[in-house]
Design a protein with these regions (language model features):
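PRPP-associated nucleotide enzymes
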Residues: 1-216
């Protein structure tokens, strides 16, 4: 159990310091991964950016994920095979437009950095299905990084197995046998507002702005 994202991030940062990271960058999955990524980037003196991904929901139940979409990749579950291709194509198009707008809003239009040859640390506040992280890694691979290191406080067993298979290194503080949801393992699992993401990202990249009253 973690007190909050900040406590988990400090522990992760200590684990990451033992690695030989060359020309590194921290890529956080918004929104919950950003407070964690911000602290790790600060502790390791690395830049911080975002990797954008969003679940693809089932038409009969949008909360039920049938895949994950990034700006340039798509990972589908087996349930998606029974759905019309036209539905999937239309939804993917809408999702990509949405996450592109969100990225520009979060970064204030700043161009995304090159990842070629870099050691990329991908962070989130936890893994439930692992689909979002899996899709993020597949997308990041296309930018030819030197390595991809996944760092998360907690993961389900299934998600850990899925992500380990595609990451170069997998650092996870807890992989409990009984897992109902990521929030189960935090005393404080408050929602991370958009304006906090914007503030943390700007501050991490040496463009100081207010955190709007929020504390890590």
């Amino acid at each position: 159990m973690f007190q909050n994202r900040a406590q988990a991030a400090i522990i992760l940062a200590q684990r990451l310091k033992s690695l030989k990271i060359n020309n590194g960058i921290v890529m956080a999955i918004p929104r919950g991964g950003v407070p964690i990524g911000s602290i790790i980037a600060q502790q390791l003196d690395l830049p911080l950016d975002l990797v954008m991904s969003k679940k693809l929901g089932h038409p009969g139940n949008p909360e039920f994920a049938i895949g994950s979409v990034t700006l340039d990749d798509l990972v589908l579950d087996g349930d998606a095979a029974r759905l019309p291709q036209a539905f999937i194509s239309a939804e993917v198009k809408k999702i990509r437009e949405d996450i592109s707008k969100r990225y520009n809003r979060f970064t204030k239009g700043r161009k995304s950095p090159s990842l070629e040859g870099k050691d990329v640390i991908v962070v989130d506040d936890g893994l439930a299905t692992g689909n979002t992280m899996f899709a993020s890694i597949e997308s990041l691979r296309k930018q030819h990084p030197n390595s991809i290191i996944v760092a998360v406080p907690v993961s389900s067993t299934a998600a850990a197995q899925k992500v380990k298979a595609v990451a170069d290194q997998f650092i996870c503080l807890e992989v409990p046998k009984i897992f109902y949801g990521v929030g189960q393992f935090y005393d404080d699992f408050a929602e991370v507002p958009d304006k906090m993401v914007i503030g943390l990202l700007a501050t991490a990249n040496h463009n100081p702005v207010s955190h709007h009253g929020y504390t890590l």
